[in-house]
Structures are given as C-alpha cells and as structure tokens.
Amino acid sequence: MDTIRAIIFDLDGVICFTDNYHYQAWKELADAEGIYFDEKINGRLRGVSRMESLDIILERASRCYTQEEKEQLATRKNESYVRLLEKMSPRDLSDEVKNTLDTLRQRGYKLAIGSSSKNTKKILKQIGLDGYFDAVSDGTNITKSKPDPEVFIKAAEMVEEKPENCLVVEDALAGIDAAYAGGFISACLLYTSDAADD
C-alpha cells in the first residue's frame, strides 16, 4: 500500500455541518417559487453543485425556467445561505474534529480541503480555521463538480502529492465516486440523522 502523506477533507458534513443552512436557504427559495421541497429532496442535493441542486428542485416546478432565471434563483439561494452562515462561529467546529486535525498535523500529514462549495473560505473563517489548511481547493477554482475528481486533483497538486499518496475523507457518495475516479484512497464518514444533530 502506498504511503499516505496528505489528507484531503470535504468541508460540509466532515469538518462542520452546514446542511441545515443549505436546507433553510433552498426551502426559502422553493417556497417563494411555489415549489414543493422537503428534507428528503434536500438529501438528494448532498455533494452536488448549486446549479445541479437547483435542477433537482426545479423537477417539481410547474413551469420551465430559462438559464438566466436559473442563475438568478441560484444567486438568491446563495445570498440567503451566506446570510445564514453569519450565524456560524468556532463553536460549530467540534472538539473532536479540531483535536483530530491537530493530531494529524503533529504527525506530519499535509492537510487540505476539497469542497465543491464556493463559500468554503467564508465557512473556514467563520469556524476559526482560516489559514489552517495547507491547501484549499473549492468551487472557486474548479470547473467540474463532484463526482468529477477535479477538486481533489487540484488539492493534491497544491500540496504537491500524487493522488495515491492522499486520503480523501468524504461524507457523500458523489465525493467517494470522485476520489475513486481520481485514484485516491478514500474514507467515508456515515452519520445517522441523530448523530449529525449532536
């Protein structure tokens, strides 16, 4: 087995939980548009881009939306989401996660973020991890979302490691598929709904 030298973490659902903020922002948008949206539908949005998420929500719409309208809807959702992120603080970073990160760093691993979110840097700042990671690859520097491996490949390049020397830690199937497609070692965190709420 190849030596693991770097660990690439997804952000949402691994380092911290922002699912509820996403849900609130999507729900607000769907309600305003008269589109049915619930937590089950929200579950389908895990690990996919904002525009792909919007397409899933619009499957239940009573009318078709132009590309321009879709972009406006996605912007509205993100504005709501960013507003909700203001509520985040270092308290949203669990002691277990922070201790794990510190231990991995002390053991000499390079640490990176590989997230499709375009709000990654804001979230890291809100939870007190701004500047903590050796590299941050996110939705602002990729053109393809998971399950394409681009976000992880860029993170590996940023820490100057080959994919086979990087462990990807994910919580979504799209992320695990992306890690596999890129030739990375992967670990999937699974949570029950009760565990995610704790």
Give the location of each predicted region:
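Active-site neighborhood of HAD-like aspartate-dependent phosphohydrolases
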Residues: 1-43
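Conserved SAM-binding loop
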Residues: 15, 113, 168
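Helix-loop "lid/cap" segments that line or gate small-molecule binding pockets
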Residues: 29, 51-65, 123, 155-156
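Anion (oxyanion) recognition and catalysis
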Residues: 31, 105, 180
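Metal-dependent phosphoesterase signature
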Residues: 36, 59-95
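Short, acidic loop-to-helix structural element flanking the phosphoryl-transfer center
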Residues: 83-113
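Substrate-recognition "cap/lid" segment bordering the active-site pocket of phosphatases
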Residues: 90-91, 118-167, 173-184
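Conserved small/polar residues in nucleotide/adenosyl-binding loops
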Residues: 191-198
